[in-house]
């Protein structure tokens, strides 16, 4: 099994972090650490989405239809 988490797992982890921070029941140090983890997850999620978009564009171009996605 791959060590890399799936997109859905990372998204769920990010949602837990956001919920913790929104509740405000964490100490400042923990809030900062959670925020940093959340930012890292956010970047990983965005990279996954960008990669998926490029894959779709490539597939669509090979099919001869759409050449650009926005």
Swiss-Prot record:
Lineage: superkingdom? Bacteria
> Single GO cellular component annotation?
exodeoxyribonuclease VII complex
Principal location class: cytoplasm
Enzyme Commission number(s) of this protein: 3.1.11.6
- UniProt subcellular location: Cytoplasm
What Pfam families does UniProt report for this protein, alphabetically?
Exonuc_VII_S
Give the InterPro entries listed for this entry. Exonuc_VII_S (IPR003761), Exonuc_VII_ssu_sf (IPR037004)
First-tier enzyme category under EC: hydrolase
Q: Which GO terms describe its molecular function?
A: exodeoxyribonuclease VII activity
- List this protein's GO terms for biological process: DNA catabolic process
- List UniProt keywords, sorted A-Z: Cytoplasm, Exonuclease, Hydrolase, Nuclease
Query: Which ranges of the sequence are coiled-coil?
Result: none
Query: What reactions does this protein catalyze?
Result: Exonucleolytic cleavage in either 5'- to 3'- or 3'- to 5'-direction to yield nucleoside 5'-phosphates
How does the annotation summarize its subunit structure? Answer: Heterooligomer composed of large and small subunits.
Q: What does this protein do?
A: Bidirectionally degrades single-stranded DNA into large acid-insoluble oligonucleotides, which are then degraded further into small acid-soluble oligonucleotides.
The family classification in the record reads: Belongs to the XseB family.
Xref: HAMAP family: Exonuc_7_S (MF_00337)
Q: What is this protein called?
A: Exodeoxyribonuclease 7 small subunit
Give the source species.
Answer: Streptococcus gordonii (strain Challis / ATCC 35105 / BCRC 15272 / CH1 / DL1 / V288)
Q: Which gene encodes it?
A: xseB
